[in-house]
């Protein structure tokens, strides 16, 4: 899906790692939430409250998911899932455009 209809967008940005990771929150009528953002090259560690699906729209990164010993390469057009209540690491190689979906009650 390349666009969203009938949504509420929170104007204030979510800013992490001194501005190297930024996003905007999108709220849907059914109560679901997504963020659209940009990852600058660098290494990042994030925790999750809910299950997350990270769709990389453009760019290139490595991700290490919970329980994995090796890094997986992710490029534009690919996605990965992160379990709720866990941590994951990203090593962003090229500026990456992403959409993160938060999956409730997982």
Swiss-Prot record:
Pfam families: Ppnp. The keyword Membrane does not apply. Keywords: Glycosyltransferase, Transferase. It comes from the Bacteria. One of its GO terms (molecular function) is uridine phosphorylase activity. Its EC number is 2.4.2.1, 2.4.2.2. It catalyses: a purine D-ribonucleoside + phosphate = a purine nucleobase + alpha-D-ribose 1-phosphate; adenosine + phosphate = alpha-D-ribose 1-phosphate + adenine; cytidine + phosphate = cytosine + alpha-D-ribose 1-phosphate; guanosine + phosphate = alpha-D-ribose 1-phosphate + guanine. GO terms for cellular component: cytosol. The keyword ATP-binding does not apply. Gene3D superfamilies: Jelly Rolls. SUPFAM superfamilies: RmlC-like cupins. Belongs to the nucleoside phosphorylase PpnP family. Catalyzes the phosphorolysis of diverse nucleosides, yielding D-ribose 1-phosphate and the respective free bases. Can use uridine, adenosine, guanosine, cytidine, thymidine, inosine and xanthosine as substrates. Also catalyzes the reverse reactions. HAMAP family: Nucleos_phosphorylase_PpnP. This is Pyrimidine/purine nucleoside phosphorylase. The gene is ppnP.
């Amino acid at each position: 899906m390349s666009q969203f209809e009938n949504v509420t967008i929170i104007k204030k940005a979510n800013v992490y790692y001194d501005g190297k990771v930024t996003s905007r929150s999108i709220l849907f009528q059914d109560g679901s939430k997504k963020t659209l953002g940009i990852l600058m090259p660098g290494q990042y560690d994030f925790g999750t409250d809910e299950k997350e699906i990270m769709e990389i729209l453009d760019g290139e990164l490595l991700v290490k998911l919970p329980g994995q010993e090796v890094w997986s390469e992710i490029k534009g057009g690919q996605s990965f899932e992160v379990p709720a209540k866990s941590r994951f690491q990203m090593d962003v190689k090229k500026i990456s455009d992403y959409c993160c979906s938060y999956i409730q009650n997982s």
